[in-house]
Regions:
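N-terminal cap/lid segment of alpha/beta-hydrolase-fold proteins
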Residues: 25-66, 432-438
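Short beta-strand element of the alpha/beta-hydrolase
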Residues: 67-76
Length: 457
């Protein structure tokens, strides 16, 4: 929604949030992260900002005179306040507004289109601060597809997320007239709805109790090493697997559309939405993904890009993913509700995960082919085609997103766009081995360098 100047003046700027604590990723404390320290530093201070009635933010302000470019950071987990982007970029002289969307608070995650009006409010808020001349939207991981979704709709209106190509249209209010951006920074992003689709286990039909051994990526006969929890799949198995994964995905999407029709025509038990449980479909980073135990998939980019090396040099080269095999818990948790089951609703599934593929669908060493990048409004590559402002895509080379990052980069309409990868950095920016040095510093130094280039904005 658009926020008038009077409304902005009414936003509460509460005292510095000294009690807010940083939180560790993945700490097993009732699903929450553990406290590790206050969000304060000699180089910056923070203020809690209320953005209307559906969002909150933490504003990082540098101790000295801030730079004229300000950043917004967004992530769908709605827990952004202590993400590294805030303190790292504030250390480098930037104001950073870390936004948490709080609408639909009872749900673990809201549909991505629901976040956008709050982001727009944040853009307008930053533009009202003294000295701010440019506003750049930044997202990491799942926040990357929020960045591309916002950027596309801010430039082209809500028609961009409800055209005939979409399996399910955006439904949020207030998507026309979103505040325009001056640039975007996309950090180690997933591909959006396709990331969910790629977790579908084709060895499952409708029940985890019955697995098809011809399609089971977690058995030795197909190339999986259960002791080492890594794999080497044959080309024949991969071809069979991807064909079956696409077929099962199409059935799941069609089942969801049939239930949507039942809701709409009144034959469902529910009038607004209904439960939708998909066994054998991974939750977030879990799933039946060949590229997790077998690193020959999504192994390298097609083209040369800038590699930020540990020795301080920057070289143009094909980016190699140096990750170890991952996804070790999936094979031993195939019947887990929290690991290998989508426990969602019909409308949420269609809005966040429904993807259309073609007969040639496959994930290769350097590409993802046969995906309709316009079939979901929650698709990073499709939305990137609607972004014309300067754009930076960064990947972490000790993770499996170097190829998705290149796909997003290739689809960007921006004339001024850059792709850079950080040698030896994992998804959370730290080094996978000590010899790769301070990968966190290298990452955010480059973001600063890119933002600061004269004439960029």
């Amino acid at each position: 929604m658009k926020i008038a100047a009077a409304a902005l003046m009414a936003m509460s700027l509460i005292a510095a949030a000294t009690a807010i604590r940083a939180q560790e990723e993945g700490a097993p404390q009732s699903g929450r992260r553990g406290a590790v320290g206050p969000v304060q530093s000699e180089k910056y201070h923070t203020q809690y900002i209320r953005l209307g009635n559906q969002a909150e933010a933490l504003l990082y302000e540098p101790a000295g005179t801030p730079k004229s470019t300000a950043l917004i950071f967004i992530h769908p987990d709605r827990n952004t306040f202590t993400a590294p982007v805030g303190p790292q970029m504030a250390d480098r002289g930037y104001r950073v507004l870390m936004i948490n969307y709080r609408g639909d608070a009872e749900a673990r995650e809201a549909n991505q289109d629901q976040y956008l009006p709050a982001i727009s409010t944040g853009v307008t808020f930053l533009r009202g601060l003294p000295g701010v001349q440019k506003v750049v939207l930044t997202g990491h991981s799942g926040g990357g597809h929020l960045v591309t979704l916002y950027g596309n709709i801010a430039e082209h209106g809500s028609a961009a997320c409800k055209d005939a190509d979409k399996i399910y249209p955006c439904t949020a209010q207030g998507l026309d007239g979103l505040a325009k951006l001056d640039g975007v920074v996309i950090l180690d992003s997933t591909l959006g709805a396709f990331h969910a689709m790629s977790s579908v286990d084709p060895a499952v039909d409708t029940s985890n109790n019955h697995r098809n051994p011809d399609l089971d990526m977690f058995i030795a006969a197909n190339g999986y090493d259960p002791a080492a929890k890594k794999a080497s799949y044959s080309a024949a198995f991969a071809k069979r697997f991807y064909a079956a994964q696409a077929a099962r995905n199409a059935k799941i999407v069609n089942d969801a559309l049939a239930r949507l029709k039942a809701i709409q025509n009144g034959t469902s038990d529910f009038s607004d939405d209904e439960p939708f449980v998909v066994e054998g479909m991974g939750d977030q980073a879990s799933g039946a993904r060949l590229y997790q135990p077998d690193t020959s998939f999504q192994a390298h980019t097609k083209a040369q890009h800038l590699l930020l090396k540990a020795d301080g040099t920057n070289v143009m080269t094909v980016i190699q993913s140096m990750r170890p095999p991952v996804g070790q818990r999936t094979g031993s948790a195939l019947k887990s509700l929290s690991v290998m089951t989508q426990n969602t609703t019909v409308k949420r599934f269609l809005a966040t995960s429904a993807t259309r593929t073609a007969a040639n669908y496959a994930i290769t060493a350097d590409d993802v082919i046969g995906v309709d990048w316009h079939s979901s409004f929650n698709m990073s590559a499709g939305n990137a085609e609607g972004i014309s402002v300067p754009a930076l895509v960064m990947t972490m080379s000790c993770h499996y997103l170097v190829v998705p990052g290149e796909i997003i980069y290739d689809h960007l309409a921006s004339k001024d766009k850059s792709y850079a990868s950080v040698e030896g950095a994992v998804h959370g920016f730290s080094p996978c081995k000590p010899e790769y040095g301070d990968t966190v510093k290298r990452t955010f130094d480059y973001v600063d360098t890119w933002l600061s280039r004269p004439g960029r904005f």
